[in-house]
Amino acid sequence: MMVLKVEELVTGKKKGNGDAGEFLPEDFRDGEYEAAVTLEKQEDLKTLPVHFVSLGEQQWKTEKQREAELKKKKLEQRSKLENLEDLEIIIQLKKRKKYKKTKVPVVKEPEPEIVTEPVDVPMFLKAALENKLPVIEKFLSDKNNPDVCDEYKRTALHRACLEGHLAIVEKLIEAGAQIEFRDMLESTAIHWASRGGSLDVLKLLLNKGAKISARDKLLSTPLHVAVRTGHYECAEHLIACEADLNAKDREGDTPLHDAVRLNRYKMIRLLITYGADLNVKNCAGKTPMDLVLHWQNGTKAIFDSLKENSYKASRIAAF
């Protein structure tokens, strides 16, 4: 087996017969190996034996050596990892560099819609549902009546309250829309807000003087509606604003009757916590307890727990 000396490996020269560099792989014949060794060992190759090269080869090797020196300088400029703080600094620098490279897409804000054509009543009512404020503004700026309604006497305010479009509700009220306007079922805006579940709209209506005790054709209050539709935050806000917990609708049902019948456990707990009457009877002579069916175990457990706690409290008070 032929043994090569270190000098032969590095310089590409072979002692004895044969051409220089003929034993090296093709990729290493043009000087890459020398540059790689320079970079890896971080030392100069001036101690290597000098061999004759042409002017072109000398320029090429000079360029390679210059590149190697630049790489060496870059390596020397890198932060040395002496402790965890150094590692953390490097990680932060990497993140910052990556962040700079990441191009943030520029999102253009949609241009405001400008309505120039006259707006008719169907377009106006549809815009209240679809939250198209420019259409609403155009209709109102043309001195039209904000309380125009459809065949069921539902106004734009009713529709906007149902969908929770706060800006449109504000604009309609500013234009003089009647908060207590009643539709065919005698529901007012506060009924529609409770049905839609928008707490912000509900708060706005109450701040503008909407009647919290308003009744529709079924004698339902806004609290009845919020409980039936399961809008907990609206129900809680109505209670906080002193809505009648034991108000009866046309069938004599209180909000608690409705909550029990619909298995709304959170509503049941909310109403009882704030003092709803467990023993009030509806027109059929039924209390909320009487409406609890055998399969409604969750509701029964709540009632049993509350009854037990109230019994213990009464015993303690007796002493």
Swiss-Prot record:
Q: Does the keyword Coiled coil apply?
A: yes
Annotated Gene Ontology MF terms?
DNA binding; histone deacetylase binding; p53 binding; R-SMAD binding; RNA polymerase II-specific DNA-binding transcription factor binding; titin binding; transcription coactivator activity; transcription corepressor activity
* Coiled-coil residue windows: 61-89
Q: Name one GO cellular component term.
A: nucleoplasm
> Where is this gene product found?
Nucleus
Q: Which UniProt keywords apply?
A: ANK repeat, Coiled coil, Nucleus, Repeat
- What is the protein name for this chain? Ankyrin repeat domain-containing protein 1
Instruction: Give residue ranges of the ANK repeats.
Output: 152-181, 185-214, 218-247, 251-280, 284-315
The record's annotation in SUPFAM superfamilies points to: Ankyrin repeat (SSF48403)
What this chain does, per the entry, is described as:
May play an important role in endothelial cell activation. May act as a nuclear transcription factor that negatively regulates the expression of cardiac genes.
Q: How does it assemble?
A: Interacts with TTN/titin and YBX1.
Q: At the top level of its lineage, which domain of life is listed?
A: Eukaryota
Establish whether keyword Chaperone is in the entry.
no
- Main location per UniProt? nucleus
Gene Ontology biological-process entries = cardiac muscle tissue morphogenesis; cellular response to interleukin-1; cellular response to lipopolysaccharide; cellular response to mechanical stimulus; cellular response to transforming growth factor beta stimulus; cellular response to tumor necrosis factor; cellular response to xenobiotic stimulus; negative regulation of DNA biosynthetic process
